[in-house]
From Swiss-Prot:
It catalyses: (2R)-2,3-dihydroxy-3-methylbutanoate = 3-methyl-2-oxobutanoate + H2O; (2R,3R)-2,3-dihydroxy-3-methylpentanoate = (S)-3-methyl-2-oxopentanoate + H2O. InterPro entries: Dihydro-acid_dehy_C (IPR042096), DihydroxyA_deHydtase (IPR004404), DiOHA_6PGluconate_deHydtase_CS (IPR020558), ILV_EDD_C (IPR056740), ILV_EDD_N (IPR000581), IlvD/EDD_N (IPR037237). The active site is at 476 (proton acceptor). Coiled coil: none annotated. Belongs to the IlvD/Edd family. This is Dihydroxy-acid dehydratase. It comes from Nautilia profundicola (strain ATCC BAA-1463 / DSM 18972 / AmH). Homodimer. It holds the Pfam family ILVD_EDD_N.
Length: 562
């Protein structure tokens, strides 16, 4: 066992002495040591109950002949950090989480890992950290929140509240309606109920095989979710106690190139958050998988979009996907397409393959999970656009487009999200404009803020089908409309988005994966020579360190290690 390095032999007497101080007995030094990476934090609705979940996991680990050691990571609630400089810290928190997993697991030579994340950057951060350690690892998340309902029964969620602010600004709803939205949208614990970033990532870790069947859709705070916790704990013990299984189920043996492909296939089929591209590129790098962004458009061409969930379809939430058969039903339906790129032979953590996991699955509600013969679209719900405005690519959630997929309009440029919010609310944006929000990339922000407030204002003001928005920042999973993010190179590194001027004509063609500004090569070269990027003042020391080390979005916004 890996943990023998800290517990076996006469020279480890001091180490054992410290372990005994925590309550370990002689017999415990013969057992595998299991790290329980929790992310309990009281301020996040998807995490305030995870302390109880960790107790369930640890109890099951002890019952199954192993020794659990719980430790915690930090967490940021993107919804609460939204719309102010707190959002600068959201994406950087992913790197702290990854570093903390790597640090605790390697410093103490733990044999295996069970991770309990749920929201936003916490799930991908834990996956990245687990890949660095490369021991057997199993993920069991806190689970999705139930959808909220208005007094008339209309289903709502957090995205409805954000858009409600825009409607209130425009005078379309009164203060009482906005208050009802605020009070009823989030009825209890769990990751926000739509296909936002948290639930997108939690379905993708199930698709990759490092979480058990049902992980992405079983609701939080239910007996079914508690049994999932116990099953995950039993399985990690079974693996850790067997030398052959320990080698077989190292996390890099599961998250390989096929698993990355499978994650993106499922992402396309369900129209997941555009943030998944950022996180999956980072995960691919940690897994030593060379994944080119151009591959996503190829995957999109071979993947039907068969499930729409809020914010793409506001009446459907994660509980509906679970009722309709869950992720296994989605994957089985995808596999029926003759040219699918879903790899059914890849391993899953419970043993066997993807094919074994989904063989008995069935779609129980074809209105929620459409049959492959009747998809929402024959191409996937995400696309990567390239052109002179984004030579290294940018991302759009095609599943959320509410208007035309081809757009030509005049640029209205803002050098920060706050500038954009002020411009939108003051009436500066009109039909046919392209809102450009720059210096919000990983380096320029720094921290790559989410642009949910500007996009929600645009939707709430009734301009969602008539205005495009492009940014080197990113979007909340709750964003919809013609919203294009992750523009690379970003403005802070001299990207074309930084050279744009008000009135420049921007052409977007989603179906041909292109985005360009209508300027001559001579004019572009002239602007490059005259260009000096803006460098923002930022609070604290961590963001300054982050800005020095972070790569752009096309590289997953990971930190340079060399």
């Amino acid at each position: 066992m890996r943990s023998d390095e800290v517990k076996k032999g006469w020279h480890r007497a001091p180490h054992r002495s410290l372990f005994r101080a925590t309550g370990l007995k002689d017999e415990d030094f013969e057992k595998p040591f299991i790290g329980v990476a929790n992310s309990f934090i009281e301020i996040i609705p998807g995490h305030f109950f995870l302390n109880k979940y960790a107790e369930i996991v640890k109890d099951e680990i002890r019952k199954n002949g192993c020794v659990p050691f719980e430790f915690n990571t930090i967490g940021v609630d993107d919804g609460i950090a939204m719309g102010h400089d707190g959002m600068l810290y959201s994406l950087p928190s992913r790197e702290i989480i990854a570093n903390s997993i790597e640090t605790v697991m390697n410093a103490h030579k733990l044999d295996a890992l069970i991770c309990i994340p749920n929201c936003d950057k916490i799930t991908p951060g834990m996956v990245m950290g687990a890949l660095r350690v490369n021991v057997p690892s199993i993920f069991v998340t806190g689970g999705p929140m139930r959808a909220g309902h208005m007094p008339d029964g209309t289903p709502i969620d957090l995205a409805t509240v954000f858009e409600g602010v825009g409607k209130f600004e425009k005078g379309e709803i009164d203060e009482e309606t906005l208050y009802n939205l605020e009070c009823l949208a989030c009825p209890g614990g769990g990751s926000c109920s739509g296909m936002f970033t948290a639930n997108s990532m939690n379905t993708l870790i199930e698709a990759m095989g490092i979480a058990l069947k049902g992980n992405g859709t079983v609701l939080a705070l239910t007996p079914e979710r508690e049994e999932l916790l116990r099953a995950a704990a039993r399985r990690i013990c079974e693996i850790a106690k067997d030398e052959q299984l320990t080698e077989q189920y190292r996390i890099k043996n599961i998250i390989n190139e096929k698993a990355i492909h499978n994650a993106f296939v499922v992402d396309m089929a369900m129209g997941g958050s555009s943030n998944t591209v950022l996180h999956m590129m980072a995960i691919a790098k940690e897994a030593d998988v060379d994944f080119d962004l151009h591959k996503l458009n190829e995957i999109a061409r071979h993947t039907s979009h068969i499930a729409k969930i809020s914010p793409s379809l506001q009446t459907v939430h994660m509980e509906d996907i679970h009722r309709a058969g869950g992720m296994s039903a989605v994957m089985k339906e995808i596999s029926r397409r003759s040219d699918t790129i879903l790899y059914l032979d890849n391993p899953v953590i419970e043993g066997g393959t993807v094919a074994d996991r989904i063989k008995d699955a069935e779609v129980k509600d074809p209105e929620v999970i459409h049959p492959i013969e009747n998809p929402y679209s024959k191409v996937g719900g995400l696309a990567i656009l390239f052109g002179n405005l984004a030579e290294e690519g940018c991302v759009i959630k095609t599943a959320g487009i509410t208007g035309e997929r081809k757009f030509r309009g005049k640029a209205v440029c803002f050098n920060s999200q706050q500038e954009a919010i002020e411009g939108i609310t003051s009436g500066k944006i009109k039909k046919g404009d392209v809102v450009v929000i720059r210096y919000e990339g990983p380096k320029g922000g720094p921290g790559m803020q989410e642009m949910l407030a500007p996009t929600s204002l645009i939707m709430g003001m009734g301009l969602g089908s008539d205005v495009a928005l492009i940014t080197d920042g990113r979007f909340s999973g709750a964003t919809r409309g013609l919203s294009i993010g992750h523009v690379s190179p970003e403005a802070a590194e001299g990207g074309m988005i930084g050279l744009l001027k008000d009135g420049d004509i921007i052409e977007i063609d989603v179906d041909n994966f292109s985005i360009n500004v209508d300027l001559t090569p001579e004019e572009i070269e002239k602007r490059k020579k005259e260009f000096t990027p803006i460098k923002k003042e930022v609070p604290g020391k961590w963001l300054k360190q982050y800005r020095m080390l972070v790569t752009n979005a096309s590289n997953g916004a990971v930190l340079r290690a060399e």
